[in-house]
Design a protein with these regions (language model features):
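N-terminal amphipathic/basic leader segments beginning at the initiator methionine
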Residues: 1-47
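Short glycine-rich or small-residue beta-strand-to-loop segments that form or flank ligand, phosphate
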Residues: 66-77, 102-108, 168, 280-282
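Short internal beta-strands
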Residues: 98-109, 311-316, 366-371
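Membrane-embedded hairpin module used as a gating/binding unit in multi-pass transport
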Residues: 209-286
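C-terminal catalytic subdomain
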Residues: 289-367
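Internal helix-turn-beta structural module
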Residues: 352-411, 418-419
Length: 420
């Protein structure tokens, strides 16, 4: 008997697997040794010493009296508490003091963070010394700067738009809608208005992105916005599920991002060389399973490795339940998934757009969910609630005709086409 574990919230769920019974592991590429906070800081500082396509940040800061830093929110693995101190050191060297710096949490349309969450996000070294703001996507809190060639209004957080030195941070990993995270995503959707975000995301209906590849119309639309509100310096990192930095790149927002994408190439994508009758998947634990809105990424990834008609067991704690008020409202008031899909095809809306992802999975697979999500939400999603992971595993393992796979970090493990 072998013991495996599924990351779940801030803990894990163990399950037993019978000896001799085949269980395929589908995992992303993360080193098992040599990772630490000290090593992460070393990689960040090395990158800051060798910016790509720009002078050092300290030189860029010289002559400016203010700076703003965009950071990822708490649903992301990006270790802002590690990125901020070296960035602030560079700014101080260039003559910009702590009190002249504003940090904006690039929430996009996600919920605002509490004081305790902000402290955890930026770290004790920074909290209380530098002003930290939750981004507001309300149009009245943003300034209109132009329109992209694809019609996306460029409406940006007023504090960010008005600042003479704009710095973006973030993590690089595949993204279902825009191909890859990091780079300009800190600006749009991170610090943009709801109108900007919705118009850009709507492009994803016509233009499918390949995970890990920024060369698609949706991402190109984001980068076009830089003509109206440039990012002056970028610091991006590639991190694993424990927030350890694996690679870092900084400098010009396009050039440094592309280098980060190159460094991350193939790390988070796994070739779909086979599909399985059953897939056991974890969203990857906290923060990837804070809410169903985020955990659905793992479900979509697992579905790519599941045969049509097959089943998926998803472990995602979802302490914040659905995690998006508008999506929850649609689920509770419309209930019929096909009605929701039809409405989204008429008019795309961010939040409810996750129903399209849900429908994509449920049209081909059945989904079993182990979660803290209230049962009525589980049923509204079209899933079967499972209180006992081991019981499901035992039933599947007992059927020798079934091929079964295990994905411990589903939100970080994206499918790619096998090599020809």
């Amino acid at each position: 008997m072998t013991i495996y574990s599924l990351p779940y919230g801030k803990a894990s769920i163990p399950f037993r697997w019978p000896a001799g019974r085949k269980l395929e592991a589908i995992v992303y590429d993360s080193p098992e040794n040599g990772l630490s906070r000290v090593q992460s800081l070393r990689l960040i500082r090395e990158a800051l010493n060798r910016p790509i396509g720009t002078p050092r940040l300290s030189q860029l800061a010289s002559g400016h009296d203010r700076a703003v830093i965009l950071i990822s929110d708490g649903t992301r693995l990006c270790p802002s508490d590690l990125l901020l101190p070296p960035l602030l050191e560079e700014l101080r060297t260039g003559g910009i003091a702590y009190e002249a710096v504003d940090i904006v949490i690039a929430l996009g349309l996600h919920r605002k963070h509490t004081t305790d969450e902000i402290r955890s996000l930026v770290g004790n070294e920074v909290f209380g010394r530098v002003r930290v703001h939750n981004h507001s996507a309300m149009p009245e809190d943003c300034v209109a700067l132009g329109t992209t060639s694809r019609g996306t209004p460029v409406e940006i957080n007023r504090l960010v738009a008005d600042c003479p030195l704009r710095i973006a941070t973030g993590g690089i990993e595949p993204h279902a809608l825009v191909g890859v995270s990091g780079g300009v995503k800190a600006l749009i959707p991170g610090a943009a208005s709801c109108r900007s975000i919705e118009h850009n995301h709507r492009l994803s209906v016509q233009h499918l992105a390949s995970p890990g590849d920024p060369n698609n119309p949706v991402h190109q639309d984001l980068e076009e916005a830089l003509r109206f509100v440039p990012i002056h310096f970028l610091l991006n990192v590639v991190v694993n599920h424990e927030r350890h930095v694996l690679q870092a790149a900084c400098g010009d927002v396009i050039a440094a991002h592309r280098e980060g994408v190159r460094l991350a190439a193939s790390r988070f994508t796994v070739p779909v060389n086979a599909q399985y009758d059953r897939v056991i998947v974890s969203a990857g634990g906290y923060p990837k399973d804070m809410q169903m809105y985020q955990a659905l990424k793992a479900l979509r990834n697992a579905a790519a490795f599941t045969r049509p008609g097959g089943s998926i067991l998803l472990a995602a704690r979802c302490e914040e339940h659905i995690g998006n008020g508008l999506l929850q409202y649609w689920l509770e008031t419309m209930k019929d998934r096909q009605q929701m899909v039809a409405k989204l095809n008429e008019r795309f809306e961010v939040g409810p757009h996750k129903v399209l992802h849900l429908d994509e999975v449920l049209a081909r697979h059945s989904v079993h969910l182990h979660s803290a999500l209230p049962r009525h939400f589980t049923e509204l999603l079209g899933f079967k609630a499972e209180d006992d992971v081991q019981a499901v595993v035992d039933a599947w393992a007992a059927d020798e005709s079934l091929t079964i796979a295990y994905m411990p970090y589903g939100s970080l493990t994206y499918p790619r086409s096998p090599s020809p």
